[in-house]
Amino acid sequence: DLSMNGYSTIGHHFGFSTLGDNPVYERMYDAALLSTGSTMFAAKLIAENQMDRVFNISGGLHHAAPDHASGFCIFNDPALAIKFLLNSGKRVAYIDIDAHHGDGVQNAFYDNDQVLTISLHESGQYLFPGTGFVNESGHPPGIGYAVNIPLFPYTGDDIYVETFKSVVLPLVRTFGPDVLITQLGVDSYHTDPLTHLQLTTRGFLDVIQLFSDMQLPWLALGGGGYDVGAVARCWSLAYGQMIGLTLPNNIPTDLVQFTGTDQDDASVTAGVVKTTNGFLDNGTDPLLTGELETTGSTSGYSFALPGAEALFQAALIPQFTHNPSLLEGY
């Protein structure tokens, strides 16, 4: 019962509160388990060489700790996926571009030299969770395998992408991972209401292309993002870029309204907002060009977006909830 004074003793102990950043909602456990199970299914596809690239947009919940929820995150699916891949004999590079520091994943592998964690984020001086400073670099034998790149508020595309090229790329090349896991939070976008970084679609996609150019088995996860339109656009474009599809500037009119949601009867409007970056942020970003290809992937990669049906068919949710070795410490 979490209703009394905003939280109960038990709920507060595990990080839940009706007043905080981990509110309890109906079927919360089921939803969190489905998201985490999808990531585990994606990791299984990568580990077994069934797919080269997998994108679970519902994943990337990087703040959760072994014993409590944190920062809207119930289970830390990136950490669990990394552990699964480690148990499969893989070395993993985890790169987190969410505006918030990926503290939960870093802490999970802080003393492990088989996992390279890199987080580019708004400095903890200004933003939750208040961590992710450059001196957080790991414990033996993992010293140097935790890398943090805290950025000042209002950092834009040019500095962000140049920093990525100068710091992230050499580290990944030197580490030589078997698998790349990325957390693609979109709250670094310039219109996000909770953060202060100033990335545009161009900068975000430049980083996605740099990930793609690494030519590694790639498990991409979602993450934060509180401008819903920006999240939808960036992840759609990332999806296309991962599989070699060029998407058009404009959403086809027959796809604007979504079947099965409360937007069915909403009027279709084009709200135009002039931004400080000098372009119109109305879903028709002039930075993007090209026409939609309908013949499928041209990248040569096998690709999957795991859905609930495939997830349950694989029975990974029961494995995830009842396998003690997989859940140890989480």
Indicate where each model-derived feature is located.
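A general "terminal functional-core" signal
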Residues: N5-Y330
